[in-house]
Structures are given as C-alpha cells and as structure tokens.
Amino acid sequence: MSSSDNYRLDGKVALVTGAGRGIGAAIAVALGQRGAKVVVNYANSREAAEKVVDEIKSNGSDAISIQADVGDPDAVTKLMDQAVEHFGYLDIVSSNAGIVSFGHVKDVTPDEFDRVFRVNTRGQFFVAREAYRHLREGGRIILTSSNTASVKGVPRHAVYSGSKGAIDTFVRCLAIDCGDKKITVNAVAPGAIKTDMFLSVSREYIPNGETFTDEQVDECAAWLSPLNRVGLPVDVARVVSFLASDAAEWISGKIIGVDGGAFR
C-alpha cells in the first residue's frame, strides 16, 4: 500500500450531519471524492441535500440523503439505523449540524439557551453515542467545536461558545470510552468560514459591524489570520477527511483548530 492510499476512503461509509449546505456539504463532498459512500443528513432542505448527493455521485461515489432532527435522540438512532440498513455498515460519522446565537447575558432567555444547547451540545452527544453503537471497529467520530469554545472570549457569545466548549470535553472523555472498539474521537474547531451565513454572522463579531460593507467584512476577517484570507468550507473538509482516514489512526481525543492561526 502506498502512503497516498492511507488517505483514501474506498470501501468506507460515512454519515455527515447538517450536510445540506456550507461546511457540512463540503465535508460530504470531500469524503465522497476520497472514495467513501456518504449519507447526507439534513434537517429541512431536501432539495439542497439532494444537490449534494448528486455532486457526490457525479464524482464517482454513491450517496443518499436522510432527513433527521439531530436534536432528537430517537431521530438520531433512526438516522443511523437507516444508514446501516441502506449501505450495510458505517465507518465514519462527522457531526456538523449546529446553530449560532448572539446575545448579552441579560437578554438570553431559557428558550434560547435550550434551543442552542439542544442541537450544538445535546445533539452532538447523542450523535456520538449512536455512532459508537453503529460504527464498525476502527471507526471515526468527528465532532464540531469552535475556536471561540476555549481559545478566545467573544462578547454576547456565551451561549454559543459554551455549547461548543462542552464538545471539547466530550472529545477527551469519549476518546477513552470508544477505545474498546478502536474508534477514534476528535473534533474540528473552525474559525470564520465563508459560507452563506458568513457575512451576517461575521458582522456580529465585529464592533459596529452593521456599518461595514461586505468587502470590509471580508477584509476584517482576513486580517485576523496571518495568512490574510478568509477560511473556506473546503479548509475544514480537508481536515475532517484526514481525521477520517487511516493516516489519522493514532490521533484521538484532540480538538483541531481550523482558523488559519486567527486565535493564537
């Protein structure tokens, strides 16, 4: 086997949550490009998910879309069951579904707190639980944290950052729990990534961001990185693809920052 073969995913089956758009879609496509068959999970937009499926198929692999609300543990169990029923087994689970939230502590309601933690924290925990139950030995669980989780405090961002901070602890503990099946558990922690939500979300991070033009938002986000550019979904997808591969079999319990060195 050549060294490049260690990065291939031929014969593997991957499931990506929140894969209808943005980072999740890029992850699903990247895994497919490396040879994996892919389950594209989505919450609401079947049309968007089917476009991702079509792209994966056009690149020579196979894929299906399955709707599931990852905030509902029963729905997560059903999602994994359907994935195994369709493809026969499961090797990789990339948990990407999440929601963002901004608000000063004085304004945060219990409903908003619960809305964010239901998906970002509770949802990812039960995705990991069901991944452990469904993955073959030697599988991969890859969760999604954030560079605001433990590296840098952000005003009006406590609920979101806290919901992601829990993921860092999950990873360290679950890596131990999952060792008996030789399953590795890691997380990616993206910074600013240029998805369809990039401009609106980035303005929340920038003081007086509502007064910035789109070009100024781009420049500000790029300035944070010594590489002087904004992150792209494919930047995260490449790291997830590596963690999913045989080349990463000795990496577990780690949170990998994917922010171009923005917070250092």
From Swiss-Prot:
GO terms for biological process: sterigmatocystin biosynthetic process. Pathway: Mycotoxin biosynthesis; sterigmatocystin biosynthesis. Induction: The genes forming the sterigmatocystin biosynthesis cluster are co-regulated and induced on oatmeal porridge or the fungal isolates were grown either on oatmeal porridge or in YEC medium (0.2% yeast extract, 5.0% corn steep liquor). Expression is positively regulated by the cluster-specific transcription factor aflR that binds the palindromic sequence 5'-TCG(N5)CGA-3'found in the promoter. GO terms for molecular function: versicolorin reductase activity. Disruption phenotype: Impairs the production of sterigmatocystin and leads to the accumulation of versicolorin A. Keywords: NADP, Oxidoreductase. It comes from the Eukaryota. It is an enzyme of class 1 (oxidoreductase). Its EC number is 1.3.1.-. It catalyses: (4S,8R)-2,13,16,20-tetrahydroxy-7,9-dioxapentacyclo[10.8.0.0(3,10).0(4,8).0(14,19)]icosa-1(12),2,5,10,13,16,19-heptaen-18-one + NADPH + H(+) = (4S,8R,16R)-2,13,16,20-tetrahydroxy-7,9-dioxapentacyclo[10.8.0.0(3,10).0(4,8).0(14,19)]icosa-1(12),2,5,10,13,19-hexaen-18-one + NADP(+). NADP(+) binds at residues 23, 69, 96, 129, 160, 164, 193, 195. CDD domains: THN_reductase-like_SDR_c (cd05362). The active site is at residues 145-146, 160, 164. Belongs to the short-chain dehydrogenases/reductases (SDR) family. Versicolorin reductase; part of the gene cluster that mediates the biosynthesis of sterigmatocystin (ST), a polyketide-derived furanocoumarin which is part of the most toxic and carcinogenic compounds among the known mycotoxins. The first step in the biosynthesis of sterigmatocystin is the production of hexanoate by the fatty acid synthase (FAS) units stcJ and stcK. The polyketide backbone is assembled by the non-reducing polyketide synthase stcA by condensation of the starter hexanoyl-CoA and 7 malonyl-CoA extender units followed by cyclization and release of norsolorinic acid. NCBIfam families: PRK07231.1 (NF005559). This is Versicolorin reductase stcU.
